[in-house]
Protein backbone atom coordinates (compact mmCIF):
# COMPACT_ATOMS: atom_id res chain seq x y z
CA UNK A 1 0.00 0.00 0.00
CA UNK A 2 1.23 3.48 -0.83
CA UNK A 3 1.87 5.76 2.14
CA UNK A 4 -0.24 8.91 1.95
CA UNK A 5 2.73 11.00 3.05
CA UNK A 6 4.61 12.82 0.32
CA UNK A 7 7.87 12.39 2.25
CA UNK A 8 7.74 8.60 2.36
CA UNK A 9 6.02 6.00 0.21
CA UNK A 10 6.28 2.34 -0.75
CA UNK A 11 6.07 0.52 -4.05
CA UNK A 12 2.48 -0.19 -5.01
CA UNK A 13 3.42 -3.40 -6.80
CA UNK A 14 6.38 -5.72 -7.30
CA UNK A 15 8.28 -4.94 -10.53
CA UNK A 16 7.58 -7.55 -13.20
CA UNK A 17 11.07 -9.03 -13.33
CA UNK A 18 11.26 -9.25 -9.52
CA UNK A 19 8.27 -11.55 -9.17
CA UNK A 20 8.58 -15.20 -8.23
CA UNK A 21 6.68 -17.68 -10.35
CA UNK A 22 8.93 -20.75 -10.52
CA UNK A 23 10.94 -22.80 -8.05
CA UNK A 24 14.62 -22.22 -8.79
CA UNK A 25 15.38 -25.65 -7.27
CA UNK A 26 18.95 -24.52 -6.64
CA UNK A 27 19.83 -27.76 -4.82
CA UNK A 28 19.69 -29.58 -8.15
CA UNK A 29 22.48 -27.42 -9.58
CA UNK A 30 25.04 -29.40 -7.58
CA UNK A 31 23.32 -32.72 -8.26
CA UNK A 32 23.59 -32.96 -12.02
CA UNK A 33 22.38 -36.55 -12.01
CA UNK A 34 19.09 -35.53 -10.38
CA UNK A 35 18.74 -32.48 -12.62
CA UNK A 36 19.40 -34.54 -15.74
CA UNK A 37 16.93 -37.21 -14.62
CA UNK A 38 14.11 -34.78 -15.30
CA UNK A 39 15.34 -33.99 -18.83
CA UNK A 40 13.09 -36.45 -20.73
CA UNK A 41 9.99 -34.67 -19.47
CA UNK A 42 11.52 -31.21 -19.17
CA UNK A 43 10.47 -28.02 -20.91
CA UNK A 44 12.94 -26.09 -23.05
CA UNK A 45 13.16 -22.32 -23.40
CA UNK A 46 14.93 -21.19 -26.55
CA UNK A 47 16.54 -17.73 -26.48
CA UNK A 48 17.93 -16.55 -29.79
CA UNK A 49 21.02 -14.44 -30.47
CA UNK A 50 18.94 -11.27 -30.13
CA UNK A 51 17.64 -12.38 -26.72
CA UNK A 52 14.17 -13.00 -28.11
CA UNK A 53 11.75 -15.71 -27.02
CA UNK A 54 8.44 -16.89 -28.43
CA UNK A 55 5.39 -15.61 -26.58
CA UNK A 56 1.68 -16.28 -27.06
CA UNK A 57 -1.34 -15.34 -24.96
CA UNK A 58 0.74 -13.81 -22.18
CA UNK A 59 3.02 -16.81 -21.68
CA UNK A 60 6.42 -17.77 -22.96
CA UNK A 61 6.24 -20.80 -25.25
CA UNK A 62 8.25 -23.78 -24.03
CA UNK A 63 9.24 -26.73 -26.18
CA UNK A 64 10.12 -30.29 -25.23
CA UNK A 65 13.73 -30.67 -24.11
CA UNK A 66 13.93 -34.23 -25.39
CA UNK A 67 13.44 -32.93 -28.94
CA UNK A 68 16.77 -31.12 -28.67
CA UNK A 69 18.87 -34.00 -27.32
CA UNK A 70 18.57 -37.13 -25.21
CA UNK A 71 20.36 -35.43 -22.30
CA UNK A 72 21.19 -31.84 -21.28
CA UNK A 73 23.88 -30.44 -23.61
CA UNK A 74 26.82 -28.75 -21.84
CA UNK A 75 25.61 -25.25 -22.79
CA UNK A 76 22.08 -25.74 -21.38
CA UNK A 77 21.17 -23.87 -18.18
CA UNK A 78 18.78 -25.23 -15.57
CA UNK A 79 16.13 -22.65 -14.63
CA UNK A 80 14.20 -24.64 -12.04
CA UNK A 81 10.79 -26.26 -11.77
CA UNK A 82 7.37 -24.96 -12.69
CA UNK A 83 3.96 -26.06 -11.46
CA UNK A 84 3.72 -29.83 -11.36
CA UNK A 85 7.46 -30.19 -10.78
CA UNK A 86 8.42 -30.07 -14.45
CA UNK A 87 12.03 -29.08 -15.01
CA UNK A 88 12.81 -26.12 -17.27
CA UNK A 89 16.08 -25.64 -19.15
CA UNK A 90 17.21 -22.87 -21.48
CA UNK A 91 19.57 -22.81 -24.45
CA UNK A 92 20.87 -20.21 -26.86
CA UNK A 93 19.29 -21.36 -30.10
CA UNK A 94 17.19 -20.26 -33.04
CA UNK A 95 13.49 -20.02 -32.32
CA UNK A 96 11.39 -22.89 -33.63
CA UNK A 97 8.30 -22.04 -35.71
CA UNK A 98 5.00 -23.02 -34.12
CA UNK A 99 3.21 -25.73 -36.07
CA UNK A 100 -0.25 -24.71 -34.87
CA UNK A 101 -1.43 -21.68 -36.94
CA UNK A 102 -4.06 -20.90 -34.30
CA UNK A 103 -1.39 -19.98 -31.75
CA UNK A 104 -0.58 -16.24 -32.15
CA UNK A 105 3.13 -16.59 -31.40
CA UNK A 106 5.54 -13.69 -31.75
CA UNK A 107 9.26 -13.28 -31.13
CA UNK A 108 9.84 -10.64 -28.47
CA UNK A 109 12.82 -9.60 -26.38
CA UNK A 110 12.58 -8.94 -22.67
CA UNK A 111 12.34 -5.16 -23.04
CA UNK A 112 9.32 -5.51 -25.30
CA UNK A 113 7.39 -7.96 -23.17
CA UNK A 114 5.85 -5.37 -20.86
CA UNK A 115 2.91 -6.70 -18.92
CA UNK A 116 1.97 -9.38 -21.41
CA UNK A 117 3.79 -12.08 -19.44
CA UNK A 118 2.73 -13.91 -16.31
CA UNK A 119 5.05 -14.09 -13.29
CA UNK A 120 6.46 -17.52 -14.14
CA UNK A 121 7.27 -16.53 -17.71
CA UNK A 122 8.95 -13.28 -16.67
CA UNK A 123 11.13 -15.07 -14.12
CA UNK A 124 12.17 -17.77 -16.58
CA UNK A 125 13.01 -15.31 -19.36
CA UNK A 126 14.86 -12.95 -17.02
CA UNK A 127 17.01 -15.74 -15.56
CA UNK A 128 17.66 -17.33 -18.95
CA UNK A 129 18.68 -14.01 -20.53
CA UNK A 130 21.04 -13.16 -17.67
CA UNK A 131 22.71 -16.57 -17.62
CA UNK A 132 23.05 -16.98 -21.37
CA UNK A 133 24.43 -13.44 -21.76
CA UNK A 134 27.02 -14.26 -19.13
CA UNK A 135 28.03 -17.54 -20.77
CA UNK A 136 28.42 -15.75 -24.11
CA UNK A 137 31.05 -13.48 -22.58
CA UNK A 138 32.72 -15.68 -19.94
CA UNK A 139 34.22 -18.51 -21.95
CA UNK A 140 37.67 -17.62 -20.66
CA UNK A 141 38.64 -17.16 -17.03
CA UNK A 142 38.84 -13.62 -15.67
CA UNK A 143 41.69 -14.88 -13.48
CA UNK A 144 44.16 -16.18 -16.05
CA UNK A 145 42.43 -16.26 -19.44
CA UNK A 146 42.20 -20.05 -19.49
CA UNK A 147 39.23 -21.69 -21.24
CA UNK A 148 36.35 -22.60 -18.93
CA UNK A 149 33.38 -24.92 -19.20
CA UNK A 150 29.87 -24.73 -17.71
CA UNK A 151 29.23 -26.24 -14.28
CA UNK A 152 26.42 -26.35 -11.72
CA UNK A 153 23.86 -26.88 -14.49
CA UNK A 154 24.88 -23.60 -16.09
CA UNK A 155 25.18 -21.47 -12.96
CA UNK A 156 28.98 -21.32 -12.94
CA UNK A 157 32.01 -21.97 -15.13
CA UNK A 158 35.09 -23.96 -14.15
CA UNK A 159 38.67 -24.20 -15.31
CA UNK A 160 38.86 -27.97 -15.93
CA UNK A 161 42.59 -28.07 -15.10
CA UNK A 162 42.83 -25.98 -11.94
CA UNK A 163 39.25 -26.31 -10.72
CA UNK A 164 38.93 -22.54 -10.32
CA UNK A 165 35.22 -21.67 -10.41
CA UNK A 166 33.61 -18.40 -11.51
CA UNK A 167 30.03 -17.26 -11.08
CA UNK A 168 27.82 -14.86 -13.07
CA UNK A 169 28.83 -11.25 -12.63
CA UNK A 170 26.15 -8.80 -11.54
CA UNK A 171 26.56 -5.03 -11.86
CA UNK A 172 24.54 -3.20 -9.16
CA UNK A 173 23.07 0.15 -10.12
CA UNK A 174 20.90 2.60 -8.21
CA UNK A 175 17.82 4.34 -9.57
CA UNK A 176 16.20 7.17 -7.65
CA UNK A 177 13.17 9.42 -7.70
CA UNK A 178 14.07 12.84 -6.31
CA UNK A 179 11.07 14.74 -4.90
CA UNK A 180 10.42 17.78 -2.76
CA UNK A 181 8.40 15.96 -0.09
CA UNK A 182 5.24 17.57 -1.39
CA UNK A 183 3.91 17.70 -4.95
CA UNK A 184 6.91 17.74 -7.29
CA UNK A 185 9.49 15.23 -8.53
CA UNK A 186 12.51 15.42 -10.82
CA UNK A 187 12.54 13.60 -14.13
CA UNK A 188 15.42 13.74 -16.58
CA UNK A 189 16.07 13.07 -20.25
CA UNK A 190 19.27 11.42 -21.41
CA UNK A 191 21.05 13.03 -24.33
CA UNK A 192 20.48 9.91 -26.45
CA UNK A 193 16.70 9.91 -25.90
CA UNK A 194 14.14 11.63 -28.14
CA UNK A 195 12.39 14.78 -27.01
CA UNK A 196 9.70 14.33 -24.31
CA UNK A 197 11.13 11.03 -23.02
CA UNK A 198 11.93 11.35 -19.31
CA UNK A 199 12.74 8.92 -16.53
CA UNK A 200 14.48 8.63 -13.17
CA UNK A 201 18.15 9.19 -12.52
CA UNK A 202 20.33 6.09 -12.32
CA UNK A 203 23.95 5.01 -12.23
CA UNK A 204 26.32 2.17 -11.40
CA UNK A 205 27.71 1.62 -7.92
CA UNK A 206 31.45 2.21 -7.66
CA UNK A 207 33.94 0.04 -5.77
CA UNK A 208 33.82 0.66 -2.03
CA UNK A 209 30.58 2.64 -2.27
CA UNK A 210 27.27 2.07 -0.50
CA UNK A 211 23.97 2.32 -2.36
CA UNK A 212 23.00 5.47 -0.47
CA UNK A 213 26.30 7.21 -1.17
CA UNK A 214 26.00 6.21 -4.82
CA UNK A 215 22.54 7.81 -5.03
CA UNK A 216 23.85 11.12 -3.71
CA UNK A 217 26.93 11.05 -5.94
CA UNK A 218 25.09 10.14 -9.14
CA UNK A 219 22.44 12.81 -8.70
CA UNK A 220 25.06 15.42 -7.90
CA UNK A 221 27.12 14.42 -10.96
CA UNK A 222 24.21 14.21 -13.38
CA UNK A 223 22.02 17.19 -12.46
CA UNK A 224 23.89 19.09 -9.74
CA UNK A 225 21.37 18.60 -6.93
CA UNK A 226 22.23 17.71 -3.35
CA UNK A 227 19.81 15.14 -1.94
CA UNK A 228 19.09 13.93 1.58
CA UNK A 229 17.00 11.33 3.37
CA UNK A 230 17.74 8.57 0.85
CA UNK A 231 15.30 5.68 1.36
CA UNK A 232 15.16 2.19 -0.15
CA UNK A 233 12.13 1.11 -2.18
CA UNK A 234 12.87 -2.19 -3.92
CA UNK A 235 15.00 -3.90 -6.54
CA UNK A 236 14.76 -5.52 -9.94
CA UNK A 237 17.05 -7.67 -12.08
CA UNK A 238 17.82 -5.96 -15.37
CA UNK A 239 19.69 -8.45 -17.59
CA UNK A 240 20.85 -5.93 -20.22
CA UNK A 241 23.27 -7.52 -19.92
CA UNK A 242 23.76 -8.09 -16.17
CA UNK A 243 22.48 -5.26 -13.97
CA UNK A 244 20.58 -5.28 -10.70
CA UNK A 245 18.58 -2.08 -10.29
CA UNK A 246 18.17 -0.96 -6.67
CA UNK A 247 15.42 1.63 -6.26
CA UNK A 248 15.36 4.61 -3.89
CA UNK A 249 13.67 7.93 -3.33
CA UNK A 250 15.29 11.02 -1.85
CA UNK A 251 14.49 14.62 -0.98
CA UNK A 252 15.79 17.50 -3.08
CA UNK A 253 15.42 21.28 -3.06
CA UNK A 254 13.48 22.78 -6.01
CA UNK A 255 15.26 26.10 -5.46
CA UNK A 256 18.63 24.55 -6.25
CA UNK A 257 19.66 25.03 -9.87
CA UNK A 258 20.31 22.13 -12.21
CA UNK A 259 23.75 21.67 -13.75
CA UNK A 260 24.77 19.07 -16.31
CA UNK A 261 28.48 18.35 -16.16
CA UNK A 262 28.96 14.77 -17.35
CA UNK A 263 27.10 15.01 -20.66
CA UNK A 264 24.72 12.11 -19.96
CA UNK A 265 21.68 14.26 -19.16
CA UNK A 266 20.30 16.70 -21.71
CA UNK A 267 17.63 18.22 -19.50
CA UNK A 268 15.84 17.80 -16.18
CA UNK A 269 12.76 19.40 -14.71
CA UNK A 270 10.45 19.35 -11.73
CA UNK A 271 7.05 17.89 -12.61
CA UNK A 272 3.91 18.10 -10.52
CA UNK A 273 2.05 15.01 -9.45
CA UNK A 274 -0.85 15.91 -11.74
CA UNK A 275 1.50 16.22 -14.72
CA UNK A 276 2.95 12.80 -13.98
CA UNK A 277 -0.50 11.28 -13.52
CA UNK A 278 -1.56 12.63 -16.90
CA UNK A 279 1.54 11.13 -18.54
CA UNK A 280 0.92 7.76 -16.88
CA UNK A 281 -2.63 7.77 -18.17
CA UNK A 282 -1.27 8.27 -21.69
CA UNK A 283 0.60 4.94 -21.60
CA UNK A 284 4.15 3.71 -22.18
CA UNK A 285 6.98 5.32 -24.10
CA UNK A 286 6.00 5.84 -27.71
CA UNK A 287 7.17 8.49 -30.13
CA UNK A 288 3.68 8.39 -31.66
CA UNK A 289 2.07 9.45 -28.38
CA UNK A 290 0.64 12.96 -28.17
CA UNK A 291 1.53 13.22 -24.48
CA UNK A 292 3.83 16.09 -23.50
CA UNK A 293 5.71 13.72 -21.19
CA UNK A 294 6.65 10.14 -22.13
CA UNK A 295 7.51 7.81 -19.25
CA UNK A 296 9.32 4.44 -18.98
CA UNK A 297 7.65 1.22 -20.05
CA UNK A 298 5.79 -1.01 -17.64
CA UNK A 299 8.54 -3.63 -17.41
CA UNK A 300 10.89 -1.30 -15.51
CA UNK A 301 11.21 -0.53 -11.82
CA UNK A 302 11.39 3.13 -12.87
CA UNK A 303 7.77 2.92 -13.97
CA UNK A 304 6.69 1.28 -10.70
CA UNK A 305 8.48 3.93 -8.63
CA UNK A 306 6.91 6.75 -10.63
CA UNK A 307 3.45 5.18 -10.38
CA UNK A 308 3.84 4.70 -6.63
CA UNK A 309 4.84 8.32 -6.04
CA UNK A 310 2.06 9.58 -8.31
CA UNK A 311 -0.50 7.61 -6.28
CA UNK A 312 0.38 9.46 -3.07
CA UNK A 313 -2.21 11.94 -1.85
UniProtKB/Swiss-Prot annotation:
mRNA decapping enzyme that specifically removes the nicotinamide adenine dinucleotide (NAD) cap from a subset of mRNAs by hydrolyzing the diphosphate linkage to produce nicotinamide mononucleotide (NMN) and 5' monophosphate mRNA. The NAD-cap is present at the 5'-end of some mRNAs and stabilizes RNA against 5'-processing. Has preference for mRNAs with a 5'-end purine. Catalyzes the hydrolysis of a broad range of dinucleotide pyrophosphates. Its cofactor is Mg(2+); Mn(2+). The keyword Metal-binding applies. One of its GO terms (molecular function) is NADH pyrophosphatase activity. This is NAD-capped RNA hydrolase NudC. A divalent metal cation 1 binds at residues 202, 222, 264. Its EC number is 3.6.1.-, 3.6.1.22. The lineage of its organism: Bacteria, Bacillati, Actinomycetota, Actinomycetes, Mycobacteriales. Divalent metal cations. Mg(2+) or Mn(2+). It comes from Mycobacterium bovis (strain ATCC BAA-935 / AF2122/97). A divalent metal cation 2 binds at residue 218. Gene3D superfamilies: 3.90.79.20, Nucleoside Triphosphate Pyrophosphohydrolase. Residues 168-293 form the Nudix hydrolase domain. InterPro entries: NAD-cap_RNA_hydrolase_NudC, NADH_PPase-like_N, NudC-like_C, NUDIX_hydrolase-like_dom_sf, NUDIX_hydrolase_CS, NUDIX_hydrolase_dom, RNA_Hydrolase_NudC, Znr_NADH_PPase. A divalent metal cation 3 binds at residues 218, 222, 264. HAMAP family: Nudix_NudC. It catalyses: a 5'-end NAD(+)-phospho-ribonucleoside in mRNA + H2O = a 5'-end phospho-adenosine-phospho-ribonucleoside in mRNA + beta-nicotinamide D-ribonucleotide + 2 H(+); NAD(+) + H2O = beta-nicotinamide D-ribonucleotide + AMP + 2 H(+); NADH + H2O = reduced beta-nicotinamide D-ribonucleotide + AMP + 2 H(+). The gene is nudC.
Amino acid sequence: MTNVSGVDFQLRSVPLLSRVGADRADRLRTDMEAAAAGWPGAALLRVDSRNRVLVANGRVLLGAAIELADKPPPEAVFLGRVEGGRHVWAVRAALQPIADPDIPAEAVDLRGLGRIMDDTSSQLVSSASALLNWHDNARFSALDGAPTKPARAGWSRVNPITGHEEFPRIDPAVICLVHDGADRAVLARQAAWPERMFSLLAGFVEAGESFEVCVAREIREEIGLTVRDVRYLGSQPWPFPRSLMVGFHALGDPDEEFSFSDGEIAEAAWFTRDEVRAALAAGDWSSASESKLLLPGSISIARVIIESWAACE
